[in-house]
Amino acid sequence: MPKYRSATTTHGRNMAGARALWRATGMTDSDFGKPIIAVVNSFTQFVPGHVHLRDLGKLVAEQIEASGGVAKEFNTIAVDDGIAMGHGGMLYSLPSRELIADSVEYMVNAHCADAMVCISNCDKITPGMLMASLRLNIPVIFVSGGPMEAGKTKLSDQIIKLDLVDAMIQGADPKVSDDQSNQVERSACPTCGSCSGMFTANSMNCLTEALGLSQPGNGSLLATHADRKQLFLNAGKRIVELTKRYYEQDDESALPRNIASKAAFENAMTLDIAMGGSTNTVLHLLAAAQEAEIDFTMSDIDKLSRKVPQLCKVAPSTQKYHMEDVHRAGGVLGILGELDRAGLLNRNVKNVLGLTLPQTLEQYDITVTQDEAVKKMFRAGPAGIRTTQAFSQDCRWDSLDDDRAAGCIRSLEYAYSKDGGLAVLYGNFAENGCIVKTAGVDDSILKFTGPAKVYESQDDAVEAILGGKVVEGDVVVIRYEGPKGGPGMQEMLYPTSFLKSMGLGKACALITDGRFSGGTSGLSIGHVSPEAASGGTIALIEDGDTIAIDIPNRSIQLQLNEAEIAARREAQEARGDKAWTPKNRQRQVSFALRAYASLATSADKGAVRDKSKLGG
C-alpha cells in the first residue's frame, strides 16, 4: 500500500518544525493525516485566457476540503503568445513550458503534495502542467479556464465571426481602412477565455480531455458560461476520491500514466488530426509522452495522419465555426463518437471519472445519449457581452447541432476531407520530418514548387514580405528559429498573416524550423528537423534554390543533387565555431535563453531537454 507523500512532513516528532509551519498556513491537528492536494493555478492579468482564474482556485479548494482533503494553492507563470508575438518576447514562450513543468515539480515535491488539480488554459501552460503531471505520476485532474466567445461585428451589412488573427491580418492590410481595422480590433476578443478558434490553447485542452485527464466538456464549454462552474466543483470532489483510491486502496488506475496510456495518446492524436488542431500539439504531445516514458514518436503521428479523415473544421481554417460551435455540436466527445464509429479509436482506455471510452460516449455523445442534462450542457452558448468574469451568463442555443452531414462536426461519410487536418512531411532537408496543418491549406496548393527566399530571422522575413520583396510563387524559408537556434522556436503568425494581407496567402509557401501559432493557416510548414542550428540541411538552402512540396505524397524536397549539398555542408563546417549559426543576425540573447538553448532538442523530439547532456 503506498504511503501518503505528505506524511513525510506531517508525521513524527522530528517533523515538529514542518508541522509548526503547516499550522501557520491554517492547518490543525485534524488535518494531519488527510491528503494534501495542490491546486495548481495560473491566474494572471496579462492573459485573457487566465484573467478570470483568480477565484477559481478557491472554488476547487473549498470542494477539496469539504470532501476530506487539505487544499494548498500555488501559481505558475503564464505567457500570452498573442501579446508576445512578433517581437523578442516570443523567444520566451516555448521555454516557459519547461519552466512551468519544473516549477510544478519543485512545488509539489518540495512540499510532498499527494495529488493535484491543474487549472490551466493557454498555449504553454496546459502542456507544461501536463508534462509535470506525467513526470510526477500522482493523481491529477485538469480543469481549464475555457474558450473565449467568438468576436462578432457587422461588415458589408453582414454579421461575421472574428478572432485575434482577423485583427492581425486587417491591421496589416493597406487596403483596409483605419475605421474598419479599428472596428475589427475592438470586436475580435470580446471575453475572457482562450482565443476562440482551434488554436493551440483550445487544441491542447481538447487533447487533455481525449487523454482522459479532464472531464467531458472541458475542452469546449465557454469560459463565460455558468455551466463551467460545475467542472471546477466536480474536480475538487473527484480528486479526493482519486487520491484515496490510490493511497488507501493501492489502485494504480488512478494515476495519470495509467489513464494517459499509449492508447490514450494515440486517441488524442487521432482527435487532433480529425479536428485540424494546432501544429503545436505535435510538439507538446511528443514532450508529454517522453515524461510518461511512452514510446510515441513522429512515426506514430505520420501513420495516424495517413488514415484519419478531417471531421471538424474550425477557425482559423474557416470563419464559420469557432469553439462555441464545436461545443454545440457535442464538443470533443462529439468528434470522438464519430471516430469510434469509424473504428479509428482504441476503446480500452479510461478517464478521470473511471469511465471507459464506450461508457463515456454512451453518456456524453449527443447523437446517442438519453441524458437530458448532458444535452442541456452542450446547448450552452455565447451571450455576446464583453466581460472578464467567469460563469457570468447562462445563454443557451435553441437546439443542438447534431447534423453530421453538413454541421460543424461530420461523420466519416461526410468528412471535410479524406485526409486529416495535420500531416508529417519528409525530405532531404527534413530528414526527421516537419509538420503542416493541412486543414488550413487550400486544395490548389497541396502541391507547390517554387524558388526559395531565405531569411535567418522572422524579423527579416516580415520586412521582406511587407516591403514587397516576396512575390507570387516564392517559397519563404525562415531558419535558425528552432528551439536551439532562436532560441525558443518562435511562432511565425505574423509572417503568415502578412502574406495574407499582401494577397499572397494562396500564392506562396512558408517553411521554417520554427513553429506556427494555432492561428496560422495557409501553406505553412514548420518544425523542420533537424533544425539549422543542429546541422540541419535547411541551413544549406540558398536564394533561388527550387523547393518542391507534395502534401498528398508527404514529401518536401530541395531540388539539388547530393554532391552540391555535400559541398555546401563542407563549406558550412569550414566556418569553425561559427558553423550552423546565422551569418548576419543581430539578436540579444539573455543568459536564461542561452541556458535553455544549450539543452534543447529539435522539434521531432518535442523540443524537450537533451537528458544525455545531464547524464540521464
UniProtKB/Swiss-Prot annotation:
List of catalytic residues: 517
Residues the record lists as N6-carboxylysine modifications: 124
Keyword flag Mitochondrion: no
Record-linked PROSITE patterns: ILVD_EDD_1, ILVD_EDD_2
Swiss-Prot/TrEMBL GO biological process terms: isoleucine biosynthetic process; L-valine biosynthetic process
Cofactor, how bound (note): Binds 1 [2Fe-2S] cluster per subunit. This cluster acts as a Lewis acid cofactor.
Enzyme nomenclature, EC number: 4.2.1.9
Classification via Pfam families: ILV_EDD_C, ILVD_EDD_N
Cofactor dependency: [2Fe-2S] cluster; Mg(2+)
Sample GO molecular function, one term: dihydroxy-acid dehydratase activity
One Gene Ontology cellular component: cytosol
UniProtKB keywords: 2Fe-2S, Amino-acid biosynthesis, Branched-chain amino acid biosynthesis, Iron, Iron-sulfur, Lyase, Magnesium, Metal-binding
Disulfide bridge map: none
Catalysed conversion reaction: (2R)-2,3-dihydroxy-3-methylbutanoate = 3-methyl-2-oxobutanoate + H2O; (2R,3R)-2,3-dihydroxy-3-methylpentanoate = (S)-3-methyl-2-oxopentanoate + H2O
Family: Belongs to the IlvD/Edd family.
Subunit relationships: Homodimer.
Function description: Functions in the biosynthesis of branched-chain amino acids. Catalyzes the dehydration of (2R,3R)-2,3-dihydroxy-3-methylpentanoate (2,3-dihydroxy-3-methylvalerate) into 2-oxo-3-methylpentanoate (2-oxo-3-methylvalerate) and of (2R)-2,3-dihydroxy-3-methylbutanoate (2,3-dihydroxyisovalerate) into 2-oxo-3-methylbutanoate (2-oxoisovalerate), the penultimate precursor to L-isoleucine and L-valine, respectively.
Protein name (database record): Dihydroxy-acid dehydratase
Lineage of the organism: Bacteria, Pseudomonadati, Pseudomonadota, Gammaproteobacteria, Enterobacterales
